[in-house]
Every structure is written in structure tokens, then in C-alpha cells.
A protein has these predicted regions:
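Activity-critical C-terminal alpha-helical subdomain
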Residues: 66-112
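Generic, well-ordered alpha-helical scaffold segments in large soluble proteins
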Residues: 1-4, 8, 60, 64, ...
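Long, well-ordered alpha-helical scaffolding segments within enzyme catalytic domains
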Residues: 53-68
């Protein structure tokens, strides 16, 4: 990651390592097994070019996690591609189908 961050001028504010227990309760579990996860806080310039740089940086991080059988936390941002969501959360399409079934008027919404 260091090489990627340097090559792409990604400004890492900090990273934390957290131990996460397996989630057996959620329909879309983040942790499918006990994980040691890394949370990155990246400096984002809140202008179009800065947001685009952060989008690409997070997509590269998601790809790196997916290649290792990991996931990413769905609600941290909306930068994941459709393929990344489907790769990390194979039941996502089923989740959307069930949501539509149980919430046909789509009252429960998120701008995520």
C-alpha cells in the first residue's frame, strides 16, 4: 500500500488495526470470520478532483481486500463499483430483492 499511496499521492491521515469478530447475525456480514482489519482515514480535498482521487484510492484498497478474501465496510463511503460490491457481498442482489418485497413503497431509504 505504501508504494500505491506514494505513486498516487494519497495522503494517509492515520490507520488503525481492529479485531473484528465473525458476524453470524447480519444478512450482509462484514466479517465472515474473525478478522484483523485495517481502517484508513485518507485526507480528501472536497472539490471534484479531490473527491475523484479519494474514490480511486478507496477502490484500489477494496480491490486489495477482495483479492485476499476480505471485504470493506459498506457504510463508510459509496466509492465501490458494482463489481466490487458483488464480489465482497455476494448476497447483495438478494438483499435488494428482499428489501423491495418487504418495503414495496421504498420508504426506508439511504443516500448511501
Amino acid at each position: 500500500m505504501r508504494e500505491d499511496f506514494r505513486k498516487n499521492s494519497v495522503a494517509l491521515i492515520y490507520g488503525t488495526v481492529r479485531l473484528i469478530e465473525r458476524d453470524d447475525e447480519s444478512f450482509l456480514p462484514w466479517a465472515k470470520e474473525p478478522y484483523a482489519c485495517t481502517i484508513f482515514n485518507l485526507h480528501t480535498v472536497h472539490r471534484p478532483e479531490g473527491l475523484k482521487r479519494s474514490e480511486y484510492a478507496f477502490r484500489r484498497l477494496i480491490d486489495r481486500a477482495a483479492r485476499r478474501g476480505g471485504t470493506y465496510y459498506l457504510i463508510y463511503h459509496r466509492y465501490a463499483t458494482r463489481d466490487q460490491v458483488q464480489s465482497c457481498y455476494p448476497k447483495f442482489a438478494e438483499f435488494l430483492r428482499l428489501k423491495k418485497k418487504h418495503d414495496p413503497e421504498e420508504r426506508l431509504q439511504s443516500d448511501w
